[in-house]
């Protein structure tokens, strides 16, 4: 069951209320799960129960995505806007320095939370930001095409396509290496989440200036970092994982054989094991 938490975040214009939808289960060390751009917390469903058997797991809809409302006026959809909100969210949920796991945009946010020492460990699955400008333009163009396609398709067409493996492949093969494994209901829900995400365009625009290279200094002794990359990632190409390792030499780099950009669907057991090992 999902729940909504509302909390206050300080801004230059005074405190503002932010609401975040999340799913929480399990017990033990807290693990915060952050999805990618245009997705929702259900991206973590394939691994959620496995993780919740050993951890206190909180999967969130980032503001402006999934069922969470947009950020209030005056907030930017960039690192400087998102990270204080996530810090305030942790305080509202009474979790102090959780382990954080993020995919794509969520991985970028997780790394920034780690850089600011807001978390115990960081596990970043195909994190955004380790691209060249050409790779970024390719990824953003692909994301815009996905968003446009989801916006143009009537809901009955999405539901009809999702009933077949071929249709699910057409809708989601950019992010999944094994799109047929995703249930029809999940594909419908995430396609609708993509087109209805109020923060999509502002987040994408903010990402144009992000490039995590030598200037991204992070103490990986104080906050251990694991970076994992699918060998069949078609959105953020796997060579970006090698670049991440060069940028963060203290990080652990893990290959996810046969996995795409959102690896939780492609190999839930492997991804869960990587997360549990990283948060032990």
Predicted regions and their residues:
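Catalytic histidine-centered segment of alpha/beta-hydrolase-like enzymes
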Residues: 259-272
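Acidic catalytic loop of the alpha/beta-hydrolase fold
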Residues: 232-236
């Amino acid at each position: 069951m999902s729940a909504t938490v509302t909390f206050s975040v300080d801004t230059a214009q005074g405190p503002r209320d932010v609401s975040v939808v999340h799913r929480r289960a399990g017990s033990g060390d807290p693990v915060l799960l952050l999805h990618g751009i245009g997705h929702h917390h259900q991206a973590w469903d394939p691994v959620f129960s496995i993780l919740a058997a050993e951890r206190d797991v909180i999967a969130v809809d980032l503001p402006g995505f999934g069922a969470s409302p947009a950020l209030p006026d005056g907030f930017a959809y960039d690192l400087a806007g998102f990270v204080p909100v996530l810090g305030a969210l942790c305080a509202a949920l009474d979790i102090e320095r959780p382990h954080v796991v993020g995919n794509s945009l969520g991985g970028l946010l997780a790394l920034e939370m780690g850089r600011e020492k807001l978390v115990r460990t960081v596990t970043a699955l195909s994190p955004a930001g380790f691209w060249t400008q050409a790779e970024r333009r390719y990824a953003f163009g692909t994301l815009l095409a996905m968003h446009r396609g989801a916006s143009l398709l009537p809901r009955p067409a999405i539901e009809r396509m999702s009933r077949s493996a071929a249709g699910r492949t057409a809708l989601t093969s950019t992010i999944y290496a094994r799109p047929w494994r995703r249930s029809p209901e999940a594909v419908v829900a995430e396609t609708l989440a993509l087109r209805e995400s109020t923060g999509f365009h502002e987040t994408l625009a903010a990402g144009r200036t992000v490039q995590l290279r030598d200037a991204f200094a992070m103490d990986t002794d104080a906050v251990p970092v694991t970076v994992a990359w699918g060998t069949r990632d078609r959105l953020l190409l796997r060579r970006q994982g090698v670049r991440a390792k060069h940028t963060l030499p203290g990080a652990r780099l893990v290959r996810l054989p046969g996995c795409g950009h959102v690896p939780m669907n492609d190999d839930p057991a492997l991804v869960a094991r990587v997360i549990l090992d990283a948060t032990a």
